[in-house]
Amino acid sequence: MDISELTEELRKQAGRNVRLGYKVKFVLDDGLIFWDGTGDKPEIGNDDKGDADTTITMTAENLEKLIQGGLDPTLAYMTGKLRVEGKMGVALKLTSMFAD
């Protein structure tokens, strides 16, 4: 998946799940995805909206695997396939949303 397809997939995930309540920035190898989950309706796009509560850095390929359930988030973190800066609890909440 390219970054636009990943962005759309995250929009679908956000629409199926409860409000996140935080801002998350995914920094990928070919761009970024910013998820603002602080409002009534999540806003997800490719513009950098500034500071996020949590920044997750990984490859686009690994984000695709994570969304589709083919990558265990804990193992990915422990093996360096993803890095988390900021609130770790937000990252954990996101991964539980992907599992639903």
Where are these regions (language model features)?
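Feature captures hydrophobic
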Residues: 1-100
